[in-house]
Amino acid sequence: MNYLIRFEDDRALSPRVVGQKFFYLAKAFRAGFAVPQAVAISTEAHQSYISHGRWPDGLLDEVFKSATNLDLSKGLSIRSSATLEDLEKQSFAGQYRTFLQVVSEAELKDKIEECWKGAGSQAVQSYLKARRIHHPEEQIPLMGVIMQKMVNAIAAGIAF
């Protein structure tokens, strides 16, 4: 199974496969906006990691290769991309993890695992409960992870 997805891949337009954040980044990229190059690790990889307690066979090598192609040595942003975030009525702002300036394979592996583990965090569970958000199809939100080229911006912002 191919767990890595690029903006051009048809699966990039499935939030259930890549998470909401990568889905919106892919839509912006396809609309012609300047979006830094990125690769998503699919939610299926997260499901496999939870089910088996380890990385899917061969995925770590693929991740390292993709990260090298994104210029890991200059720093990557590792971003959570959950199925339950950036929703119409709930942003989930601050509930999931983002790591900046990741420059080594060891750090990359660690930060991806932290993103995966964050899906089941007490903070996320409390957020879901407080807002009465139910997701009966899974016990915790599915988590994609984004590996994205760093942009060392002078100013940044977000729009809803």
Give names to the regions the model predicted:
Residues G157-F160:
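Short beta-strand scaffold segments in enzyme catalytic cores
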